Design a protein with these regions (language model features):
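Aromatic side chains
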Residues: 13-14, 35, 39-40, 63
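Single conserved hydrophobic/aromatic residue that forms the stacking wall/gate
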Residues: 1-13
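Generic detector of short alpha-helix boundary/capping microenvironments
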Residues: 1-2, 26, 36
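Conserved NAD+-utilizing ADP-ribose enzyme module
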Residues: 7, 21-23, 34, 54-160
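Short aromatic-glycine-(Arg/Gly/Cys) micro-motifs in beta-strand/loop hairpins
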Residues: 11-33
Length: 160
């Protein structure tokens, strides 16, 4: 291992179907994402499996991660106003300077509340009342090519 790695996250899972992803790459899509463009994974295996079940071929790719302390890493340890503002900025198309962003995911239901807040339909306080998760969520976005070097492909599992 490279001496510049500071901490490992252990296994992370790519929440997608179709086929294993041995060589991760930054995806730039039409739709804006919580933490901007990048390669999204999670440390919660069950979450990745739930996402994979949306596809005909239900595949979860598995990686080992060693974070490089030289990279710009932003971690949201909990859902806070800063987390919400960051998601709103990213979903609005604003760029950020981080290589890796880690934190809770605004799933479909939560994103509806984010949209309502952005539209002024609900207040920030109302957002937080509505934003209680049924189960915890987690995401890591590898935003740059340098960040992708922290990932080592270990294999995949088919979700039944």
């Amino acid at each position: 291992r490279d001496s510049s790695t500071s901490r490992g996250l252990g296994d992370v899972y790519k929440r997608q179907g179709y086929a294993p992803v041995e060589n991760p790459e930054i995806r730039i899509g039409r739709n804006t994402k919580d933490f901007g463009n990048g390669f999204y994974c999670t440390i919660i295996k069950e979450q990745a499996q739930r996402w994979a079940k949306r596809y005909d071929t239900k595949i979860v790719s598995i990686y080992d991660v060693r974070l490089n302390s030289a990279l710009q890493i932003k971690e949201f340890k909990e859902m806070t106003d800063e987390w919400l503002d960051f998601i709103i900025d990213c979903r609005s198309g604003k760029k950020h300077a981080y290589d890796i962003v880690i934190g809770a995911m605004a799933d479909d239901q939560i994103y509806n509340y984010v949209s309502d807040y952005m539209d002024g339909s609900i207040t920030r306080e109302q957002f937080w009342v509505l934003a209680k998760f049924k189960y915890p969520t987690h995401q890591i976005n590898f935003c740059t090519k340098e960040a992708l070097k922290c990932l080592e492909y270990r294999g995949f599992e088919e979700v039944l």
